Amino acid sequence: MKSPAPSRPQKMALIPACIFLCFAALSVQAEETPVTPQPPDILLGPLFNDVQNVKLFPDQKTFADAVPNSDPLMILADYRMQQNQSGFDLRHFVNVNFTLPKEGEKYVPPEGQSLREHIDGLWPVLTRSTENTEKWDSLLPLPEPYVVPGGRFREVYYWDNYFTMLGLAESGHWDKVADMVANFAHEINTYGHIPNGNRSYYLSRSQPPFFALMVELLAQHEGDAALKQYLPQMQKEYAYWMDGVENLQAGQQEKRVVKLQDSTLLNRYWDDRDTPRPESWVEDIATAKSNPNRPATEIYRDLRSAAASGWDFSSRWMDNPQQLNTLRTTSIVPVDLNSLMFKMEKILARASKAAGDNAMANQYETLANARQKGIEKYLWNDQQGWYADYDLKSHKVRNQLTAAALFPLYVNAAAKDRANKMATATKTHLLQPGGLNTTSVKSGQQWDAPNGWAPLQWVATEGLQNYGQKEVAMDISWHFLTNVQHTYDREKKLVEKYDVSTTGTGGGGGEYPLQDGFGWTNGVTLKMLDLICPKEQPCDNVPATHPTVKSATTQPSTKEAQPTP
């Protein structure tokens, strides 16, 4: 989908030329891409629609994950023949023709475990292996074992795993880190990108691109050999995110690429399909029907693209925070995504240099420098004093402060003075008694107040430390860890998200109940434990008093969350 091209001719910019040269390198590892596995809504057609619409299962993901016991075409033919017969029982038909996903066994930790011991004991519990899957299974096979988040999430998720891997590395499980990098490289080789998760219904989109950072993490243990080994896959993923750029004129967008009027190249989230998500079928149809003024396909695409962002859902994507049907993810240029693209370009430059290709390294450096200028020009709100997303419809930077604003600091793309302003904004508007707020908006969506998420806590902590803002960074870690510890002390589990307006309470909102496990919370908790406790005195639980600032820590904001961005 392209927006109209401007009438005046545009000069070929330096940056697309660089991209052409970078893409030329991809020919060396181009492989035959097999037939893409079809998602269950396509395989099963009206049967899938009917099962989901009558809400046969409380969680729509259940039937999306069910495995047909025979050829779906035969099952569908039987369904069409039987469905109008007297006494037809849809539930019985499904039970006969499908193998439903098993409920995971509830993990009961041994008595008296510390927080660290509990997490270390969870790694094998959350590890799965699926070298082979059934022919019509929505689950995609992976060559190596992998760690799942936990709860209803029975598969590996892209950006979740980076933060899980941080914890694995902290625990010395470098073999598991290597396995998961190998799995993601396999997906790039097989499908041309890393899907949202290893399910057929996730193949039409990706998630925040952390693969290059995963390779960089592995290189901490294996050295430049890891960078050289996975350079082809990093290049291929970059090509996926920049697909279509060679045909863009100023003011146009194509899939995941945006070319602004001055030819600045940035990226957005995008899903290649514009139908309801199989795992949230009924909810998406209801959302689309609730706004008859917009084409349903447009709403479906924006819902899917929000899922690609990892922030599903948030006022960040919505015109009206109380109405999900006003989300327009594809017309927003996200600050976190473009920070990650900058980091990918920097790591590609480093890997190319390690491989002895200095010319290609220079090309990637040129791309990274251009993107950094674009971030500073378009994704900084000078009036508010923080980084924010850019609105393609209004042609202005948005006003809303979110935790995504810390990503330029995390990847070292921020100007020093702006990083200092971000520290002030974070302390004033986002820091709460239980950690960092995702936004300051109460919308009922899970990526809004009062929820705090482990990956965003770590991005903020590490990003602020990168710019010497250690006090604010340590306070974020301290408040969040206290929340995690209090919840663990009471419930003996770690959860997906937390209510940061207090301590000791899991988060709420969103499309499904609170999940426990939980991969990225485990990983970030281990990193933070080792951050707040000195190496000579490591801690297995969160200390009773602030270990760095003994007396007056930075006080979190006590302001009420605002109803609108």
UniProtKB/Swiss-Prot annotation:
Gene3D superfamilies named among the record's database cross-references: 1.50.10.10
Quote a single Gene Ontology cellular component term. periplasmic space
For this chain, one GO molecular function annotation is:
alpha,alpha-trehalase activity
User: What reaction does this enzyme carry out catalytically?
Assistant: alpha,alpha-trehalose + H2O = alpha-D-glucose + beta-D-glucose
Leader sequence segment: 1-30
Where's it found, cell-wise? Answer: Periplasm
Q: Which residues form the active site?
A: 312 (proton donor/acceptor), 496 (proton donor/acceptor)
Q: Where is the composition biased (Polar residues)?
A: 548-565
Query: What are the alphabetically sorted keywords of the record?
Result: Glycosidase, Hydrolase, Periplasm, Signal
Region called Disordered, residue ranges: 540-565
- Its EC number(s): 3.2.1.28
The record's top EC class is: hydrolase
Q: Give residues annotated as binding substrate.
A: 152, 159-160, 196, 205-207, 277-279, 310, 511
GO annotations under biological process?
A: cellular hyperosmotic response; trehalose catabolic process
Family stated for the protein in its record: Belongs to the glycosyl hydrolase 37 family.
Task: Write out the function statement from the record.
Answer: Provides the cells with the ability to utilize trehalose at high osmolarity by splitting it into glucose molecules that can subsequently be taken up by the phosphotransferase-mediated uptake system.
Q: Which NCBIfam families match?
A: PRK13270.1, PRK13271.1
* PANTHER family, per the entry: TREHALASE
Assembly behavior: Monomer.
What name does UniProt use for this protein?
Periplasmic trehalase
Q: Which organism is it from?
A: Shigella flexneri
